[in-house]
Amino acid sequence: VSHSTDDIFDEFGYRRLSEKYGVGLIDLNNTDFESVGNPEFLRFDNIYYPSVLKDAFLVSLPVLKGDDEFEMAGALSNMIGAFPARHYKGFFSTGKNKIRKWNLKYSVHDINLCKMPDFALIDASEHGYILAGQPLEMDKQGARLLGFDWKEIGYLKLLDDTLSEERDKDKSVGELIER
């Protein structure tokens, strides 16, 4: 079921909070975007990504839960919302059907390579916790709270592998090599 962002802003009280505290709301489906390419993408050639997020300090605020499509809903899977619907909806639907051409773990991986959230604040209160910190690490902790091995969560394993390879490349730059 697809809902308009305006309906969601109203239904969950975001518009009321926005007005009360003078904080703006942005519908990422209707904002300017740029085409982003990355050789590390696993399925997309390029992604239309909201320009407003590129240089912003991005905080992901999910509720931790198991999920049929993602295995686990966390800070990184929450970024699926950054895919603008006008580019990823099907011809006869308002949902983002084009991100479901393949397993969603690939869409989560690729959108997070455009820009990973800078911080995660995960409501895991159902399990007695609030998780706060680096998004990948917080999602790993969330998986543990849900009784999963994080390496069995497709998008977490893919992102960890990609980011580990990048860290390994960074470590090799400037190392003294003995003969």
Task: Label every model-predicted segment.
Residues S2-R179:
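Extended, low-polarity segments enriched in aliphatic/aromatic residues
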